[in-house]
């Protein structure tokens, strides 16, 4: 992400989070607004899934594009790009079948996600006064109107 930001002339403002339960989100997000951020992007970590609604509400309040990596939580984000969890769960079933047939879990390779989903939200774009490029819309797996 750092390289891409540099190439595009962007600056990344980080809001470090160790444990979501102990973070004062209002203070953290106010720091982001004070830093004049122009978008919110969450890091791909499960700790962020519980606060997606809060981040989306904050992004809406301050008219910031919000992007994250959980396709199942796409309704309030401008864009989502992340692993296809349905595919991951199907793959998990294959692992279970292999274990039930006697294969040792310690000897099985770890798999990374094979499929990713991109969802763009035209409704959010319109509310923010943005027009999504046609090339992005064409690449999206789903477009929310």
At which residue positions do the language-model features occur?
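Short hydrophobic alpha-helices and adjacent helix-cap/hinge residues
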Residues: 1-145
């Amino acid at each position: 992400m750092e390289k891409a930001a540099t190439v595009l002339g962007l600056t990344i403002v980080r809001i470090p989070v160790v444990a979501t339960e102990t973070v004062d989100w209002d203070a953290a997000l106010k720091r982001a607004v004070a830093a004049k951020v122009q978008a919110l992007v969450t890091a791909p970590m499960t700790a962020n899934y519980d606060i997606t609604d809060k981040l989306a509400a904050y992004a809406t309040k301050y008219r910031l594009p919000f992007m994250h990596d959980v396709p199942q939580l796409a309704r309030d984000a401008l864009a989502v790009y992340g692993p296809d969890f349905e595919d991951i769960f199907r793959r998990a079933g294959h692992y279970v079948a292999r274990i039930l047939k006697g294969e040792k879990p310690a000897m099985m390779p770890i798999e990374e996600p094979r499929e990713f989903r991109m969802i763009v939200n035209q409704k959010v774009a319109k509310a923010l006064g943005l027009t999504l490029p046609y090339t992005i819309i064409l690449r999206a797996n789903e477009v929310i109107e």
